[in-house]
């Protein structure tokens, strides 16, 4: 059921395949971190669900071509908590909670919804946040063109230590600078 909601959401906000791409971007780094098969399986399960809370966001806000108002930004920032409310009651989905709730937390504490910082952010969410941002940057959106993978890797590197865990960002850039990345459409 959650997977169907996630796919419907991707169609609704014109990001088809986003969750699968995020999982594919994060998985090689998870292997390099020594995650076991169970943990990799949770990544594959949780990554496509990470934005499920966007079902609570109005479509016109998700597709807005210009800058968001403060009210619209507040609406967007509710999606991690809304997603947590969707997955928490479902026994089999609870382990996806770090991916859903914390993927917009920043290494320096400037993220949302809670403002966690550093290692207080679950490593699963820190890794997913990098993969999520990279896929967003390399995907065309109503409000901007897609960046090349090389330019997006430069952005990940530039945000290491502020938005992203510096060690994970370095590992992500090292991994994906030596492998071809198919940019999203």
For the regions a language model picked out, list residue spans one by one.
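Histidine- and acidic-residue-rich, metal-dependent catalytic cores
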Residues: 1-185
């Amino acid at each position: 059921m959650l997977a169907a909601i996630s796919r419907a959401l991707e169609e609704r906000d014109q990001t088809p395949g986003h969750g699968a791409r995020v999982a594919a971007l994060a998985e090689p780094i998870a292997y390099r971190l020594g995650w076991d098969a169970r943990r990799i399986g949770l990544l594959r399960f949780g990554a496509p669900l990470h934005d499920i809370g966007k079902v609570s966001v109005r479509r016109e806000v998700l597709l807005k071509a210009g800058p968001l108002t403060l009210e619209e930004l507040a609406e967007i920032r509710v999606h991690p908590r809304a997603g947590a409310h969707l997955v928490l009651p479902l026994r089999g989905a609870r382990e996806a909670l770090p991916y859903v709730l914390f993927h917009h937390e920043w290494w320096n504490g400037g993220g949302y919804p809670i403002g966690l910082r550093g290692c207080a952010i679950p490593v699963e969410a820190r890794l997913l946040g990098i993969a999520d941002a990279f896929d967003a940057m390399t995907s065309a959106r109503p409000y901007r063109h897609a960046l090349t993978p090389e330019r997006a890797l430069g952005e990940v590197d530039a945000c290491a230590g502020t938005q992203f865990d510096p060690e994970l960002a370095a590992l992500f850039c090292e991994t994906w600078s030596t492998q071809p990345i198919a940019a999203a459409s």
